[in-house]
Structure formats: C-alpha cells, structure tokens
C-alpha cells in the first residue's frame, strides 16, 4: 500500500527483448548469427541508437545482443514507427565495397549473379540479398550494370527491416520501470518515504544493457538491502 500510495512508480514494460519484423524473408535466414555488423535503430528518419557486434535473424524477426540493447531505446512500441538498418560490411566504405564487388564479378565471369554472392555473404543470406537487389538471379555477373552493382552495394550497407513489435514479454531478459531511484536511499536501499521498506532488483526503476549489468544491479541492491536490514 505504501508503494502504491506514496512512491512514484513507472509502469513496467519489457526490455532487452527480440523484435518481430514486417519482412517475411527473415525466416529464410533464421538461425543466422551475423558478427561484426553495424546496426542503427531508426525512428522518424533519425537514428536513436547505434551499435556494432552480433545480430541474429530469427523465424519472426531479429534478435542478438545489438537488437536486445536497441530494444531498451524504444519507450513505447508502435508498429511501423521503428526500423533497423543493418550494415553488413561496416569495415568497407561504399566505394571500397563497390571495388570488392567488381573484383568478385571479374573473378566469376559467366557465373549466375545469385551464385556469385556466396563469396561475399553467408550462404543462407546470399539468395535473400540477391532477391532483394532486384537483379535477376540468372543474370551473368559480367552483364550486371554499374548502377545495379552500386545499388547492390547500397543494399549491403543498408539492409532494412521494419519493426512490427516486440516478442512476448516472456522472452524479455528484464523488465524496466518500477520505483523511482530518487525515492530510495542508494546506500541502504531503504525507502525515503516509508521507513522500514527496502527495495532490490527489478522492482527499482534501474536497468542496463546486456552483459551482466542487470545481474550486478540485482546482486548489489539485494546485498545493500540485506545488510541494512540486518544492522537496523
């Protein structure tokens, strides 16, 4: 009763959670764990979060460490409001990537375009990118135009998926929200408003990214609260 009547409590919501996408092609790449890719979480044409690392394609959308961290930057999920732009070749500029593609095509003259991408992309993703590029799969690589090649490069640097929503809350690593930290003594975790009331873990409006930070918050707040209670 004291919590509800006197404390400021932010509504609970899932965080560090995989996302579902509008695009169905992701299911064809399900299970593919991309490493060393860059991603941007976009909202209204602006990047609200950027990250580099691992990204996982799933049967329903996207997951993995970068996506889980990105989910923490979505205060309220609205279908169609957010998108994720993936740079599959972040180490290369568009010019460098175009030179790489041109070199690969030169080494594979007479090969089908769709087959030529297997040296550039994971086998599971290559046919998807080939289809998204709009270049006919059976077209010989030496027949691909300069503009088509550059469009392919732009696709590789900006593969975009549109977010439909979060996965079920049961799949979230944590929930965010809870009792305001301003109303809790950080040394003892005791309520500043209700003496004798202590808080720990996810009931507090305090959370972090993946990587053990939330476990540390839980352990540290629980230890502080238990120590304070034992000495009260």
PLM feature spans:
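Predominant activation on well-ordered alpha-helical scaffold segments within soluble catalytic domains
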Residues: 67-68, 150-153, 157, 219-227
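Short, compositionally biased leader-like segments
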Residues: 6-12, 158, 166
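A conserved FAD-binding loop/helix module that cradles the flavin
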Residues: 206-232
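A glycine-rich dinucleotide-binding beta-alpha-beta segment and adjacent secondary-structure elements
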Residues: 127-207
């Amino acid at each position: 009763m004291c919590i509800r009547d006197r404390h400021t409590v932010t509504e609970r919501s899932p965080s560090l959670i995989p996302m579902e996408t509008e695009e169905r092609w992701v299911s064809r790449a399900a299970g593919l764990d991309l490493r060393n890719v860059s991603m941007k979480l976009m909202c209204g044409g602006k990047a609200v979060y950027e990250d580099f690392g691992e990204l996982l394609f799933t049967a329903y959308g996207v997951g993995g460490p970068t996506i889980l961290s990105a989910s923490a930057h979505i205060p309220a999920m609205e279908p169609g409001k957010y998108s994720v732009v993936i740079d599959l070749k972040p180490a290369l500029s568009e010019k460098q990537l175009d030179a790489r593609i041109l070199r690969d095509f030169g080494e594979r003259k007479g090969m089908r375009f769709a087959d030529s991408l297997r040296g550039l992309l994971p086998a599971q993703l290559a046919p998807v990118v080939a289809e998204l590029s709009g270049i006919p799969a059976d077209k010989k690589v030496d027949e691909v135009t300069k503009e088509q090649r550059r469009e392919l490069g732009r696709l590789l640097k900006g593969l975009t998926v549109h977010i439909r929503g979060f996965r079920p809350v049961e799949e979230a690593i944590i929930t965010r929200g809870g009792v305001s930290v301003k109303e809790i003594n950080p040394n003892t975790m005791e309520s500043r408003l209700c003496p004798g009331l202590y808080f720990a873990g996810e009931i507090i409006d305090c959370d972090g990214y993946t990587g053990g930070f939330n476990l540390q918050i839980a352990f540290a707040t629980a230890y502080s609260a238990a120590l304070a209670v034992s000495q009260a």
